[in-house]
Amino acid sequence: MSKVYVFDHPLIQHKLTYIRDKSTGTKEFRELVDEVAALMAFEITRDLPLQEVTVETPVGPATSKKIAGKKLGLVPILRAGLGMVDGILRMIPAAKVGHVGLYRDPETLQPVEYYVKLPTDVEERELIVIDPMLATGGSAVEAINCLKKRGATSIKLMCLIAAPEGVEVVKEAHPDVDIYLAALDEKLNEKGYIVPGLGDAGDRLFGTK
């Protein structure tokens, strides 16, 4: 069964307060999301395997460590997931970036894939699916489906804020995918928004309505 991790680092929680604040403007909101994504990347990579190597310093040889195992890949869900990519790349600059685009069918209300572009070696990478909000869980489940259909076997989900309903949907659909959050909020309202949440992450990132 998948595990859920909520990061309580003081810097993450401090910045998340300003992200939630409706008076925070687009520029500051964008910068804060970027910063929190970078901090979350630090936390989500704590379990990466290491191997010992020997390097030459200006003084002499040194035994040190470097990351081993699968290479990393980032997969933002369009469009709001894009706001978290640069912050993560600052921490993991060698990661390749794919994209998954989804829209909601007006009749069935189910997410439909309209764009998928992934690294050619997804089966050899540990992929981090990125979306600021995990509300109903439908988009996250479908994005993970897209990756698995193309051969991905090692996947994590990173979101700023989640509703319990969305977390349970993802856990049921993908029990092999761990979920990493900055906050787990109270519930969804009748419109499917996370309460208290932060509003529409995409609109606040890109200055749209």
Curated annotation (Swiss-Prot):
Disulphide bridges, residue numbers: none
TM spans (from-to): none
Residues holding uracil: 194, 199-201
The reaction(s) this protein catalyses: UMP + diphosphate = 5-phospho-alpha-D-ribose 1-diphosphate + uracil
Gene3D superfamilies in alphabetical order: 3.40.50.2020
Activity control note: Allosterically activated by GTP.
Domain of life: Bacteria
EC number: 2.4.2.9
Pfam family, one: UPRTase
A GO BP annotation: uracil salvage
Ligand binding (5-phospho-alpha-D-ribose 1-diphosphate): 79, 104, 131-139, 200
Cofactor: Mg(2+)
Swiss-Prot/TrEMBL keywords: Allosteric enzyme, Glycosyltransferase, GTP-binding, Magnesium, Nucleotide-binding, Transferase
Textual note on the cofactor: Binds 1 Mg(2+) ion per subunit. The magnesium is bound as Mg-PRPP.
Family: Belongs to the UPRTase family.
Function of the molecule: Catalyzes the conversion of uracil and 5-phospho-alpha-D-ribose 1-diphosphate (PRPP) to UMP and diphosphate.
Name of the protein described by the UniProt record: Uracil phosphoribosyltransferase
Source organism per UniProt: Halalkalibacterium halodurans (strain ATCC BAA-125 / DSM 18197 / FERM 7344 / JCM 9153 / C-125)
Name of the coding gene: upp
